[in-house]
Design a protein with these regions (language model features):
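Transmembrane beta-strands of outer-membrane beta-barrel proteins
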Residues: 1, 35, 47-51, 92, ...
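Short glycine/proline- and aromatic-enriched beta-strand/turn motifs that initiate or cap beta-hairpins
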Residues: 1-58
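Transmembrane beta-strands of outer-membrane beta-barrel pores
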Residues: 3-9, 53-59, 98, 111-117, ...
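Flexible, solvent-exposed loop segments that connect beta-strands
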Residues: 11-25, 59-83, 115-131, 200-207
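Residues that define the transmembrane beta-barrel architecture of outer-membrane proteins
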Residues: 17-19, 29-33, 86-90, 103, ...
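Outer-membrane beta-barrel "beta-signal"
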Residues: 40, 210-222
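Short loop/turn motifs that connect adjacent beta-strands in outer-membrane beta-barrel proteins
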Residues: 42-48, 99-105, 146-151, 179-186
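Detector for outer-membrane/organellar transmembrane beta-barrel domains
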Residues: 91, 112, 125-159, 169
Length: 222
C-alpha cells in the first residue's frame, strides 16, 4: 500500500473546436494525489489484486472566443469563463505474476472508472461534459531488482485502442526499499507518468490530450 503526488501537466485539445488546454484554457501543472493498495498471495490460479485511486483536477480562468464549442453549444460571443477539467479515476486490476525473481513480470487486466467532468462556466453561457465511464484496459508491469542495494526499476502500463477510444497510461520508476520494522518494509519511489487520451466522437466527446510529469510516492509492504 502507499500513496504519492503526481506533478501533471496537460497538453493537447478537447472539444469539437479543438480547444487547447494550455494556450486557450490556461491550464498548467498541478499536484495531484494518488493512493494504492495491492494484495498478493501464493494461490496459483487466483489473480492478485491492485486498486489505485488517482486525482486529476485542473482549474483556471480563460477568455474564450465566439464559436468555442466544447460539446455542441458554441459560445455566441467572447466570454470570460471559469475552467474545470476533472479526470479523476479508480483502477481495479487483476493480474498474475509471470516472473518473480531478479526480473519481475506481471500481466493482467484493469477496469478503470472515470468520475469527472470538463466545464466552461461563463456569466451568460456554460458548457459541460460528464466524464463518467468504465472501461477495460490491458495491464503489464516489468521490473528489475539490483541485488544487495535495495534498488529496483519498474515500467508499468495500462492500454486500450479501439475504434473511437485510445488510452495509453504508462509510468517508469525507481524505488529504494529498506526495512522499517521487522515485519514492515518501506519504499521511496521516484517516477515519471504519462497518460495519453484520444476520443473521436465517443458519446459526443472529442479529445486529443496528454497529461504527464514526475511523481513521488511512499510504499509500505507487510
Amino acid at each position: 500500500m502507499g500513496g504519492g503526488s503526481w506533478q501533471a501537466s496537460p497538453e493537447g485539445d478537447i472539444g469539437r473546436t479543438d480547444i487547447n488546454l494550455e494556450s486557450t484554457l490556461n491550464l498548467d501543472e498541478e499536484n495531484n494525489q494518488f493512493v494504492f493498495v495491492a494484495i498478493e498471495h501464493p494461490i496459483p490460479l487466483l489473480p492478485n489484486i491492485r486498486v489505485q485511486h488517482s486525482e486529476m483536477e485542473w482549474n483556471g480562468d480563460a477568455l474564450v472566443a465566439a464559436g468555442t464549442n466544447l460539446n455542441g453549444n458554441p459560445f455566441v460571443s467572447t466570454e470570460q469563463v471559469a475552467v474545470s477539467l476533472d479526470l479523476t479515476h479508480t483502477d481495479a486490476t487483476l493480474y498474475y505474476e509471470i516472473l518473480d525473481n531478479v526480473v519481475d513480470l506481471d500481466l493482467g487486466i484493469t477496469a478503470r472508472s472515470f468520475d469527472g467532468e470538463a466545464s466552461l462556466i461563463g456569466a451568460t453561457q456554460q458548457e459541460a461534459i460528464d466524464l463518467d465511464a468504465i472501461g477495460p484496459l490491458l495491464y503489464g508491469r516489468v521490473g528489475v531488482d539490483i541485488p544487495l542495494t535495495g534498488l529496483s526499476a519498474h515500467v508499468l502500463a495500462n492500454w486500450i485502442n479501439v475504434d473511437e477510444f485510445r488510452l495509453i497510461d504508462w509510468a517508469a520508476e525507481i524505488m529504494y526499499e529498506f526495512d522499517l520494522l521487522p515485519a514492515l518494509d518501506a519504499g521511496l519511489i521516484l517516477g515519471y507518468r504519462s497518460m495519453l487520451v484520444e476520443l473521436d466522437e465517443l458519446d459526443d466527446l472529442q479529445a486529443d490530450a496528454s497529461f504527464e510529469g514526475y511523481y513521488f510516492a511512499l510504499q509500505l509492504r507487510f
